[in-house]
């Protein structure tokens, strides 16, 4: 399957068409961004690590019965995926307090949230991805009530699968975001799951093993990503 025209260039990935109208090529670049793209740097191997990491996680979620767009890996940095009609709202699960939640509510970082919080954000960099709710989605027609309920159900299901997966690897799944779209009318998990879009802490040291290392200028970004992948058993060779 050969990539053809560039359809979209995001902050860390590029999407290409293929000869099949139902399939796309997702290319992971070495770019890393913070502040809605205000700060961008390149890190060797990052595209490869995230591509293989994403394939591994999507495979685990598919095994658990969650529909995903993943078809197969094409190269170290490329994957073949289904073409989805993307929903412009992302789903976030928070198992512990971190990031914007701490700033917004003034609560202590790291406290456990039981039950986990479920948030919705409009995907709009210019507006800094504002927080929205089910009522906004219905009023503005971003996604139907039925499909939103399915997105929420699948997000919680993914959380159950991934919390155990990371816990077994000595990691805490603090929070993460998922993006969904429709494939032939079915709600399907799209975009990616990687340390770019999740917070992962070491269970023993509480060290941050995700993109917060870049956001907070902690250093060792790729080393942390590769360590997470190694613990999970992701083959990076």
Curated annotation (Swiss-Prot):
Pathway: Purine metabolism; IMP biosynthesis via de novo pathway; 5-amino-1-(5-phospho-D-ribosyl)imidazole-4-carboxamide from 5-amino-1-(5-phospho-D-ribosyl)imidazole-4-carboxylate: step 1/2. One of its GO terms (biological process) is 'de novo' IMP biosynthetic process. Pfam families: SAICAR_synt (PF01259). It catalyses: 5-amino-1-(5-phospho-D-ribosyl)imidazole-4-carboxylate + L-aspartate + ATP = (2S)-2-[5-amino-1-(5-phospho-beta-D-ribosyl)imidazole-4-carboxamido]succinate + ADP + phosphate + 2 H(+). GO terms for cellular component: cytosol. The keyword Ligase applies. Disulfide bonds: none annotated. Its EC number is 6.3.2.6. The keyword Nucleotide-binding applies. CDD domains: SAICAR_synt_PurC. GO terms for molecular function: ATP binding; phosphoribosylaminoimidazolesuccinocarboxamide synthase activity. It is an enzyme of class 6 (ligase). Keywords: ATP-binding, Ligase, Nucleotide-binding, Purine biosynthesis. HAMAP family: SAICAR_synth. Belongs to the SAICAR synthetase family. This is Phosphoribosylaminoimidazole-succinocarboxamide synthase. It comes from Cronobacter sakazakii (strain ATCC BAA-894).
